[in-house]
Amino acid sequence: MAANKPKGQNSLALHKVIMVGSGGVGKSALTLQFMYDEFVEDYEPTKADSYRKKVVLDGEEVQIDILDTAGQEDYAAIRDNYFRSGEGFLCVFSITEMESFAATADFREQILRVKEDENVPFLLVGNKSDLEDKRQVSVEEAKNRADQWNVNYVETSAKTRANVDKVFFDLMREIRARKMEDSKEKNGKKKRKSLAKRIRERCCIL
């Protein structure tokens, strides 16, 4: 009799997170801090880097897959493909750069266009909270935008690690809740189809 195989990575729930935002706002720094507990200040502009990690989410072991996309306009054309594969989005700007905050509206619009879903799991993230003296975007301004979009707003610092775990775990919870919701809807449709089929069969017998 074969021994039971240990639970492999393939059987763990996988949550796919996409990092979006302008170049230089700290998307890669946040990702690397979450993955490796390291702050990397000088980082080459990313085309797209993918990371995977096992974490414990509310007592359950899961995998998170993080795709760190490029902020530069040169790569805008290939973003659609990345967005299609994502289940949730961390939309990052720097609190020290108003332009990067303004750009979040374009990223949000592009995501909604590709996903065709206004309720896609999404967090607005104001990074570089350690640079309070250089702040250009007020908390109130960012929260107002998040409220308009019906999403949560969190400020982070990749340097001090403030709220880094929080944004990834909060987004994973949103993704998980969405999957459960979709699964219920799917099962409901299957039950309705099955019931309709039984009614049709009964009508044929009669």
UniProtKB/Swiss-Prot annotation:
This is Ras-related protein Ral-A. Pfam families: Ras. Residues 204-206 form a propeptide. One of its GO terms (biological process) is Ras protein signal transduction. Belongs to the small GTPase superfamily. Ras family. GO terms for molecular function: ATPase binding; Edg-2 lysophosphatidic acid receptor binding; G protein activity; GDP binding; GTP binding; GTPase activity; myosin binding; ubiquitin protein ligase binding. Coiled coil: none annotated. InterPro entries: P-loop_NTPase, Small_GTP-bd, Small_GTPase, Small_GTPase_Ras-type. The keyword Ion transport does not apply. A lipid is attached at residue 203 (S-geranylgeranyl cysteine). It catalyses: GTP + H2O = GDP + phosphate + H(+). Alternates between an inactive form bound to GDP and an active form bound to GTP. Activated by a guanine nucleotide-exchange factor (GEF) and inactivated by a GTPase-activating protein (GAP). SMART domains: RAB, RAN, RAS, RHO.
